Every structure is written in C-alpha cells, then in structure tokens.
C-alpha cells in the first residue's frame, strides 16, 4: 500500500519516521508493505531520506491511483479542508490529527467519506494528555 503524508512539520515528519522504523511490524499487521510515496510540503528537504518524495501540488496525490491512504498533518482549516475533501472524493482513505479541521468541518468530511465509500479517521490529544478526541 502506498500512502501520502500532507505536511512535513513535527507531526508529519514523525509519521514518516514511525512508519519507517516500524515498517516490518506494520506490514505484518496490514498484510502488505506500507510505503510513503509522497510528502506534500511547501519546502524542499535536500539531503534527507524524503528529498525525492517531496511534492508541492496536492492534486498529484489525488490523481495517483496507487495512493490508498493519505495522512493530513498540516493543521488549520485551510488549505487542509480543500485538500482532504478532494482526497475523499478521489476515493482515498484519510487520517488526520488536525483538531481545527475536525471541529470546523468534521461532520461535512464524514459525510463526504461515507458518500464515497472511504474512511475519514481522526484522533488527537489535548495538552499532550489522553486521547480525548476520536
């Protein structure tokens, strides 16, 4: 399964790192290898393991039939809402930890996901404590 990560700040880079460190365990549980194909960010990351995966146009992800899962880690409502909405409409499963997005547009995104037969998953921690938003 090929995935894309939208945003490569603290959370996005952590997602990529955890996927790489635990790739064997994840592949065993998922029943297939998981590969990060794209990382969407405004910046470049020369000399890093992801430098060849960086893209700047979210539509590349939406239009790629190999991408099954998208992890949104950008934060804020926009452009996250626009990007996530298009991913769901393109038949991609989406996971986010973006509390602002879920609070402002969660009901709408859940409906879009349901209408397109995909999942919109979210979980977050408030104050670094217990996972209270699911």
Model-based region annotation:
Residues 1-89:
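N-terminal glycine-/serine-/threonine-rich beta1-alpha1-beta2 phosphate-ribose binding loop
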Residues 80-90, 97-134:
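Rossmann-fold NAD(P)-binding glycine/threonine-rich loop
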Residues 69, 95-98:
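Structured catalytic core of nucleotide-sugar glycosyltransferases
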């Amino acid at each position: 399964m090929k995935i894309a990560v939208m945003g490569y700040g603290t959370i996005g880079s952590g997602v990529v790192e955890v996927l790489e460190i635990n790739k064997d365990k994840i592949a065993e549980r998922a029943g297939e290898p998981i590969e990060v194909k794209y990382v969407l960010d405004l910046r470049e990351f020369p000399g890093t393991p992801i430098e060849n995966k960086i893209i700047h146009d979210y539509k590349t992800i939406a239009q790629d039939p190999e991408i099954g899962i998208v992890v949104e880690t950008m934060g804020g409502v926009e452009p996250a809402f626009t990007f996530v909405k298009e991913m769901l409409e393109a038949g991609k499963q989406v996971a986010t930890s973006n509390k602002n997005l879920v609070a402002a547009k969660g009901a709408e995104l859940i409906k879009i996901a349901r209408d397109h037969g995909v999942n919109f998953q979210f979980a977050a921690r408030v104050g670094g404590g217990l996972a209270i938003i699911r």
